[in-house]
Amino acid sequence: MITLHNGNETIELLTDDNSYSYEAVMGEDTLTLYFSHPGYLNVPVGSWCEFYGKRYSLKKDSNFKKNGERNYSYTLVLETSKADTELWKIRNTVDNRIKFPYTAKPKEHLKLIVDNLNRRSSGWVIGECIEGTEKLINYNHTVCLDALSQLAETYEIEYQITETVIEGVHTKTVHLKKV
C-alpha cells in the first residue's frame, strides 16, 4: 500500500506486484507504480509519496488505460528531486550570467551548483567531496544536471544525490566522490 499526498488530500493505492523502484549512479531515480481502480482517479502533478526514506514526486501527468466500464489501469512514474536538476540553469552567483568560465576546486564548483539549486528550491546541501586542483569549467546555458556530469567528468569521478526525510525535513545531499 502506497500513500500519495497532495496538499491536504491523501490517496491510498494498492499497487501491483510489478511496481518497482530504479536507481542508477549518475542516472535516473524513479518509482514506477502500477495499479487498477474501479473508476477514474485524478492524481495531480505534484503528488508525492515517501518510499524507503526518499520522497518521490509526480512530475508528469499519470498514464491510464480504460478497460471496460469500471476498470482503469494506471502507470505512475514518480521521480526524486534529481529530476528538478534538469530544469534549472547554472548562473554566476555574482552577476547572474548564464555563460561564464569558472576556475575553482571541486568543492567550489559543487557549491556553485548547490547554490543554484537552492535558488529554485530548498534543502540542497553539499555532501562528501573529493579534494583536487583548480580546474576551468565553462558554463554555457548549462542545466544543473549537466553541470554535475561535466564536473564529474572533469575530475574523473562520480556524483550522487541522496535524499532523506527526517521528521518532515526534506534534505537533498549532492556528493562528488567514488560511488
Q: Which positions does each model-derived feature cover?
A:
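Charged- and aromatic-enriched interaction segments used to assemble
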Residues: 79-179
